[in-house]
Amino acid sequence: MTNYPTLSHFQKIWKTLLFLLLLSSPMTAQNSTAAPKKAYNRTASPDVTRIDPTNWFADMQDPTLQLMVYGKDIKFADVTTDYPNVKIDSLVRLDSPNYLLVYLNLKGAKPGEINLTFSNKNGKKTIRKYQLKAREMAGTDRKGFDISDVLYMLMPDRFANGNPKNDVIKGMEDQLCNRNEPSLRHGGDLEGLRQHLDYFTDLGVTALWLTPVLENDRPADNGKNSTYHGYATTDYYRVDPRFGTNEEYKALVNECHKKGLKVVMDMIFNHCGDYHPW
């Protein structure tokens, strides 16, 4: 009678092969000599480098707010506040130790400065003030553009240079500005737009659509990666200093409104620049 292998024979063979495979695996060898994982410092005061969004508004239709907190090892902090009608619904700790999501409920909260207290298990604390502003008007009171409007789309950098002093900003990655080079920044800015608003009204334009004016702080690589167009955002809450300031942007919009011009704010949310902290 022929003796056929039984199931137990195959199991023994499989276990032997698996054992040999593990012994010879490069991964096994690497793991045996790998450096220990970095121990995060949970004893120092929490490092709160940045909070996004930079401020928010009371009496929004949706009272919930997500704060993205950035700082070294901030993942391990707890967060509390004693501001009236501000409730911390939850904390979400991400894979990265340097981010923490804080979900707030602002139902009934009045405008003011919220003290957010970040604390570690050793009792050390960091307090950050977070501004809750009053809304100028409800969203339902704002009128957007429609089919009756004549839109003029433009790149501010390519329109008019009203303030040559902001062509190059010390400390920014891109230090190049040259109108003779097609791929570099040319120096156009918000002040240049403000000085020529009558040009648009004379054309019969009723709405201006600016390509993004938010910060695009990355190297131009001699024009290979220039961001004069504005589509490589590195800060969603700051106008690029080479265009002007947040205050100048608001002033421009107010002046446009006085002249019967609407302003479309172009913002890119499906991607950001590769120099953004995210």
Predicted features and spans:
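N-terminal structural segment of carbohydrate-active enzymes
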Residues: 123-242, 246-262, 272, 277
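Bacterial Sec-dependent N-terminal signal peptides
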Residues: 1-39, 43-49
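Catalytic metal-binding/acid-base residues of hydrolase active sites
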Residues: 268-270
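Immunoglobulin-like IPT/TIG beta-sandwich domains and homologous Ig-like subdomains
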Residues: 60-122
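Beta-strand/beta-sandwich contexts
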Residues: 34-75, 128, 133-135
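Hydrophobic/anchoring residues in structured secondary elements
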Residues: 53-56, 81, 93, 215
